[in-house]
Amino acid sequence: DHGNMFGAIKFYKIAQQYGIKPIIGCEVYVAPESRHQKSSAQGMADASYHLILLAANMEGYKNLIKLVSIGYLEGFYYRPRIDKEVLAQYAHGLIALSSCLKGEIPILLAHGQERRAHEVAATFKDIMGEKGFYLDEIFNNYN
C-alpha cells in the first residue's frame, strides 16, 4: 500500500491460509524537509518522496502503524507524509528500501546529483542502522 496499510490484514490472512509467511510493509511518503511544512515549489510533484518500510518483527509492525498514523495526523499535505526526524524515532524493527523512481535517492541520481544521493543514503543508513537500509535495483526500461 502507498501511505497506508489498508490491505495488511487481508493480505496477512490470505498468506497464512496458503502457508506463506507475510512480510507487512508500506511505501510511505517522506517530506523533503519537515512533515509540518505544508508548502512546496511545485505542489504535489515535490511534496514527498517514496520510501518502502518493511516490518522485521512485532516492534517494527507497531512502529510502522505509528509512522503511518503520524503521516495522516501530522504530515498530511496532498498525501500522508512522515519525515526523517519521526522515522528516526520509530525505526526499530523496520527495514527500509530506497524505493522506486519516485524515491529521494533515485530522483537525485536521475538529476546527476550523485554526491547528494550518497549523503541521503548515509542518512538513511544512520537512521535505520547498519542492516536496516537497502538500495533497490529496479529495471525501469530507461536508457
Describe these PLM feature segments.
Residues 2-143:
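Phosphodiester-processing cores and adjacent nucleic acid-binding clamps
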